[in-house]
C-alpha cells in the first residue's frame, strides 16, 4: 500500500515539472518513443465528467492534464478480437473479416508495429494481444456461428461479484501485474540503453470480469472481482442505477442479448450497484498499472521523450440496458477511453471530434514520420492533438465527422452497424429492413432510452444512406451469415459422432439439456436454408 501511495504522490508531483517543455520536446532530433497501453472493457465515459466522479483514476487524470483526451472515441467492433484486429490493422471490421472472437487477422499480417520496426524502431509487446485467428473457447465460437438459429438459450451464468476482504491486497489481477512488471523491467533494462526510438505495447485484461470456475446454477458466470483496497477508491454515492425498459418494450435484438446473458430475471438495486461498484474498482486497479508505466518513464528520464497513449478495446455495460459484458452499440459498451500525452501533444486539450480505434494505426506511423498507406480506414490523430497545428478548419476536414462500428459475434442475433455523427447515433441491423433500426439523440438522451427513428424519419433515412455509402451492410450481413454456416458445418463434421454430446455441454447446457432434440432440429433446419452473399 505504501508503495502505491508513493506512486500516486509522485504522479501528482510530475504535473508541476518542466513547464513549457512541450515546445522543446517536439523539436527533438530523433522521433519520439511510443508507449501504447490497451486495457479490456474500460468504459470511456469514466475518463471525463461526470463519469470521472465515480472512481479515483489518478494516472488517467494525470494524462488528461498533461495531454489530450478524446471525448468521443469508439471501438470499431465491441468485442475483443475484432476490435483489436481493427486497431492493429487500421481497417474496419468488414475489411479484416474478423467476424467474431475466433476469426481475427492472419498471424503474419503486417501491423503498425511491424512497419515501425522496419523503419528503425525497437519494438516489444507484453500482455494481451488477441487480434489473430484461432483463439477463444469452442462455446464462444459455436454461439457466434449459431446466432441465426431459431432458438433462445442462456449462454452465460448470472453475473456475480466477489470481494477480497483485505485492505492491503493491491495486486488482485496477478497476470496483468506480471505483464506490467515485465514491461517496466524492459524499460529499465533494455529501452534505456537504446540509441534508436522504441515502441512498446502493454495489453491488460482488466477490467474485464473474471470467468467463474464454479459449477452448479451459475456455471460459466462472469465475476466482478476486487479487493477492499480498490473498492475504497469508488464513490458509492456517485454510482448511478441505470434505468431499464420493460422486457416487453425492449428492442428485439436487445432482448436476445439480455436473455442469452442471463439478465432477464430479477435484480435488486443492491445487486446492480454492487456489480457497478466492483467494476469501477477494477478500473482503479487498471489505472494503477498504467501508472507504473508512467512512473517508470519518469524515473528513467524518458517521459519527456515518449508519447504515451491509453485506450481500450471496448467498454463494459455493467448492467446498463439490462446487460453486462459488451457486444452492444450502447455507450457503455462502444465508447472507449483514448488519451495521449508526450512531445508535441497539446496539454489539457479535450477533443470532441468522433474518432475510433482504426485511427491508432495511422497515428503510430505519423508519430514515427512514416508515410501513411492509402488503404487505411483510419486517420492520424496528431492533427487533432498537436501543439503546433493551428488551422482548425483543416483539422475538421482531416477526420470525417463520423465513425463506423459493427458487430457480428455471439450474444447478438443480427449483424449490427453503428454510425456515430455529431450528436446522433444510428444503429442498423442485418439487411436494414427485417429489423427496426435505432436512432438516439445523445445530446438530449445520453442514456439511450428513447429510440427516435420513427419520430425523425428524414434523419434516419439520411444516416442510413450515409451508412450505405461507407459499407454495403446488407451484403456484409449475408456474407457473415454464410460464413457462420460454413464454419459450423466444418466444426460439426470434425466432431463426428460426438456432436450431440459436445453441443449439449457447451455454456448453454442448462437450457439445451431440457429439450436437446428440439434444439438440434432447429440447427438442422437452419443449415438447410442456404444463402448466396453474391445474390444480395
UniProtKB/Swiss-Prot annotation:
UniProt: Ca(2+) binding residues: 40, 80, 313-314
Cofactor note: Binds 1 Ca(2+) ion per subunit.
Positions annotated as active site in the UniProt record: 80
Catalytic activity: an aryl sulfate + H2O = a phenol + sulfate + H(+); Hydrolysis of the 2-sulfate groups of the 2-O-sulfo-D-glucuronate residues of chondroitin sulfate, heparin and heparitin sulfate
Gene Ontology, cellular component aspect: endoplasmic reticulum lumen; extracellular region; lysosome
Cofactors that this protein relies on: Ca(2+)
Main localization category: secreted
Free-text description of this protein's post-translational modifications in UniProt: The conversion to 3-oxoalanine (also known as C-formylglycine, FGly), of a serine or cysteine residue in prokaryotes and of a cysteine residue in eukaryotes, is critical for catalytic activity. The 75-kDa precursor undergoes proteolytic processing to yield a 23 kDa form.
EC assignment: 3.1.6.1, 3.1.6.18
Signal peptide: 1-22
Documented effect of changing residue 80 to A: Loss of arylsulfatase and glucuronate-2-sulfatase activity
Residues listed as glycosylation sites in the UniProt record: 108, 166, 193, 262, 375, 413, 498
Key words, A-Z: Calcium, Disease variant, Glycoprotein, Hydrolase, Lysosome, Metal-binding, Mucopolysaccharidosis, Secreted, Signal
Domain of life, per lineage: Eukaryota
Alphabetized SUPFAM superfamilies for the sequence: Alkaline phosphatase-like
GO molecular function per UniProt: arylsulfatase activity; glucuronate-2-sulfatase activity; metal ion binding
One Pfam short name: Sulfatase
Tissue: Expressed at high levels in the placenta and pancreas. Expressed at intermediate levels in the lung, brain, heart, liver and kidney and at low levels in the muscle.
Residues given in the record as substrate binding sites: 128, 251
pH-activity note: Optimum pH is 4.6.
Residue numbers bearing the 3-oxoalanine (Cys) modification: 80
Cross-referenced InterPro entries: Alkaline_phosphatase_core_sf, ARSK, GAG-degrading_sulfatase, Sulfatase_N
Assigned protein family: Belongs to the sulfatase family.
Its biological purpose: Catalyzes the hydrolysis of pseudosubstrates such as p-nitrocatechol sulfate and p-nitrophenyl sulfate. Catalyzes the hydrolysis of the 2-sulfate groups of the 2-O-sulfo-D-glucuronate residues of chondroitin sulfate, heparin and heparitin sulfate. Acts selectively on 2-sulfoglucuronate and lacks activity against 2-sulfoiduronate.
Protein name as annotated: Arylsulfatase K
Highest classification ranks of the organism: Eukaryota, Metazoa, Chordata, Craniata, Vertebrata
